């Protein structure tokens, strides 16, 4: 897969390239989007059981970007559904990582959009706009810093300060 951010490098290969200093997320997310492999520049939002702020962010054009959503690991309400995921896809986002729940998983699973989340819950979240944007969020032993780079695939998530160039093949 290639996009405006260059060639995707599988996370296992990134670990081999980077070595012991790798920033690999320990949290075991479920792949719920139609794209398992996705990557891009990180934008963050911290919100608890409220998705109005993240919806407005995904409504902004961000070709190849990845929104990291820290919902404090709550599975009580869904932060992303098919409408919000479709909004992100339509504005060029590569995908989302949700430290929380989503809903409409069957529809999201058919979208050309990356989505990793802890699980699902059909319950809607509130819509007050509470939350913080572009702050460092931390989970799974990794700090997700706005402007840094995220690679996600079926093996997990790796975060780097900048995109990694694939080594030349022999």
UniProtKB/Swiss-Prot annotation:
Cofactor: how bound: Divalent metal cation.
GO molecular function: 4-hydroxy-4-methyl-2-oxoglutarate aldolase activity; metal ion binding; oxaloacetate decarboxylase activity; ribonuclease inhibitor activity
EC assignment: 4.1.3.17, 4.1.1.112
Cofactor entry: a divalent metal cation
Record's keyword terms, sorted: Lyase, Metal-binding
InterPro entries: RraA (IPR010203), RraA/RraA-like (IPR005493), RraA/RraA-like_sf (IPR036704)
GO BP, sorted A to Z: regulation of RNA metabolic process
SUPFAM superfamilies on file: RraA-like (SSF89562)
Binding locations of substrate: 81-84, 103
Gene3D superfamilies the UniProt entry points to: Ribonuclease E inhibitor RraA/RraA-like
Catalytic reaction list: 4-hydroxy-4-methyl-2-oxoglutarate = 2 pyruvate; oxaloacetate + H(+) = pyruvate + CO2
Binding site for a divalent metal cation: 104
Subunit structure: Homotrimer.
Family label: Belongs to the class II aldolase/RraA-like family.
Function in brief: Catalyzes the aldol cleavage of 4-hydroxy-4-methyl-2-oxoglutarate (HMG) into 2 molecules of pyruvate. Also contains a secondary oxaloacetate (OAA) decarboxylase activity due to the common pyruvate enolate transition state formed following C-C bond cleavage in the retro-aldol and decarboxylation reactions.
Protein's name in the database: Putative 4-hydroxy-4-methyl-2-oxoglutarate aldolase
Species of the source: Corynebacterium efficiens (strain DSM 44549 / YS-314 / AJ 12310 / JCM 11189 / NBRC 100395)
């Amino acid at each position: 897969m290639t996009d405006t951010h260059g060639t995707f490098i599988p996370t296992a290969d990134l670990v081999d390239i980077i070595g012991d200093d790798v920033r690999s997320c320990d949290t075991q997310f479920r792949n719920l989007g139609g794209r398992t492999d996705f990557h891009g520049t990180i934008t963050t939002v911290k919100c608890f059981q409220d998705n109005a702020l993240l919806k407005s962010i995904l409504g902004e054009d961000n070709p190849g970007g990845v929104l990291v959503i820290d919902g404090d690991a709550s599975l009580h309400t869904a932060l992303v559904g098919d409408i919000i995921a479709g909004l992100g896809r339509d504005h060029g986002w590569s995908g989302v990582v949700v430290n929380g729940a989503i809903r409409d998983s069957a529809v999201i699973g058919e979208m050309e959009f990356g989505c990793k989340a802890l699980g699902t819950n059909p319950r809607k979240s509130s819509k007050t706009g509470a939350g913080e944007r572009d702050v460092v969020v931390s989970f799974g032993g990794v700090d997700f810093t706005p402007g840094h780079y995220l690679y996600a695939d079926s093996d997990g998530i790796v975060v780097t300060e900048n995109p990694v160039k694939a080594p030349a093949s022999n």
